[in-house]
């Protein structure tokens, strides 16, 4: 809705139901909105993602062409409503990125403690038994890098989550206002930083597993595929 020259100020938010609902709340005739196809994704394969088609003429609700939708809130405020939802969703994206990164880190530590390969650094005895790869300095470097990324991301997410509560529940108006202002600054950081660096941690988790990390015998490849979405959705990283 709105004039074209209004730009984003002219955008409104609508809900378009599958079935038209009458004033009594009963489901009526079929609305002209259909699933046009499935998106075949790199990750998150346990969730369905679709392409929707509106008003293509397959159904004619109320005998007229086009899909019927109900406006949500005030006309021309659709983008503002979307950002109200997305800002807290961005914190959830950061939390999801941390969870996937942390899982990969823990898997890496467990694997590095049991996988044996090579001799200790500086040992030249050919008959020395192989040692767990966690004893190799470069493997430790990769593990510590993962730990720094995921624990830093976790601290950031927990701090932002506390600010969400304080924005509403702090005892004074001054404290509530300060929490809200700080959250405005931190929200894009909480989304973008864990999304980038916890994905890097997942990449290192694959590297620690070696060739096995590239197979589906171990879950680290799935963790990377699932986490790859987080730098993209709810506000794309640069």
What are these regions (language model features)?
Residues 1-238:
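Internal glycine-rich alpha/beta core junctions
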């Amino acid at each position: 809705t709105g004039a074209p020259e209004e730009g984003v100020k002219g955008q409104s938010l609508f809900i378009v139901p599958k079935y038209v609902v009458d004033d009594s709340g009963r489901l009526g005739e079929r609305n002209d909105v259909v699933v046009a196809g499935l998106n075949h994704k790199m990750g998150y394969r346990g969730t369905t993602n679709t392409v929707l088609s509106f008003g293509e003429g397959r159904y004619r609700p109320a005998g007229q062409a086009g899909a019927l939708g109900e406006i949500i809130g005030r006309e021309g405020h659709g983008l503002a409503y979307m950002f109200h939802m997305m800002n807290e969703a961005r914190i959830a994206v950061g939390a999801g990125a941390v969870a996937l990164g942390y899982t990969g880190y823990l898997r890496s530590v467990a694997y590095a403690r049991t996988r044996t390969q090579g001799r200790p650094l500086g040992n030249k005895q050919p008959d020395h038994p192989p040692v767990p790869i966690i004893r190799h300095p470069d493997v430790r470097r990769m593990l510590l890098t993962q730990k720094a990324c995921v624990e830093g991301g976790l601290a950031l997410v927990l701090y932002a989550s506390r600010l969400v509560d304080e924005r509403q529940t702090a005892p004074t108006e001054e404290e509530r206002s300060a929490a809200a202002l700080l959250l405005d600054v931190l929200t894009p950081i909480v989304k973008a930083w864990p999304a980038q660096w916890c994905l890097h941690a997942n990449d290192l988790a694959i590297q620690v597993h070696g060739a096995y990390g590239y197979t589906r015998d171990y879950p680290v490849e799935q963790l990377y595929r699932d986490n790859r979405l987080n730098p993209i959705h709810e506000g794309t990283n640069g």
